[in-house]
UniProtKB/Swiss-Prot annotation:
Protein name: Natriuretic peptide Mc-NP
Cleaved propeptide residues: 26-75, 117-139
Signal peptide boundaries: 1-25
Disordered as annotated region, ranges: 45-72
Keyword Disulfide bond: yes
Species of provenance: Micrurus corallinus (Brazilian coral snake)
GO MF, one annotated term: hormone activity
Protein role: Snake venom natriuretic peptide that dose-dependently induces the rapid relaxation of rat aortic strips phenylephrine-precontracted. Acts by stimulating cGMP production in a dose-dependent manner (by probably activating NPR1 and/or NPR2). May also show potent hypotensive effects. A synthetic peptide (AA 77-108, where the Cys-95 is replaced by a Ser) increases sodium excretion and urinary volume in rat kidneys.
Domain of life: Eukaryota
Predominant cellular place of this UniProt entry's protein: secreted
GO process terms (BP): regulation of blood pressure; vasodilation
């Protein structure tokens, strides 16, 4: 390996400039400039222009789907379901598993440690089984 002392000056810059080419085999794409990011939002957009811009702005949305992502277009149950989570987004995994999400509702309480351990601690007689079942499932 070439020592860093030999790469002083322009040598280190040359290595850094050629590093992306060595890794990918092609240069990195240039990031869009600030004016090119601002121009589409600086003036009103006609429907013809919107059809051209939409696939560029939202590539995951199929062309001609009619869905502009606006919640005002939703009606009935679909609109009600939008407000079930944090900021209008459903967070089922966080809410149901850990209880840390928004609008958390737990229907059944978690069994206590004692109720989880007792069935495995010793053989149970029929009389004891009825008492254990009442402890594990009150009501």
């Amino acid at each position: 390996m070439v020592g860093l002392s030999r790469l002083r000056g322009g040598g280190l810059l040359l290595v850094l400039a050629l590093l992306p080419l060595a890794l990918d085999g092609k240069p990195l794409e240039e990031a869009p400039t600030a004016p090119s990011r601002i121009i589409p939002f600086s003036r009103p957009v006609r429907k013809q222009s919107q059809a051209v811009l939409d696939p560029m702005v939202h590539p995951e949305r199929p062309a001609g789907s009619g869905d502009d992502g606006d919640s005002r277009r939703l009606e009935g149950l679909a609109k009600e379901a939008l407000g079930d989570g944090c900021f209008g987004q459903r967070i089922d995994r966080i809410c149901n598993v850990s209880g840390m999400g928004c609008n958390h509702v737990r229907t059944d309480p978690a069994p206590t440690a004692l109720a989880r351990i007792i069935p495995f601690s010793r053989p149970v007689r029929k009389e004891s089984r009825a008492a254990l079942d009442r402890m594990q499932q009150p009501g």
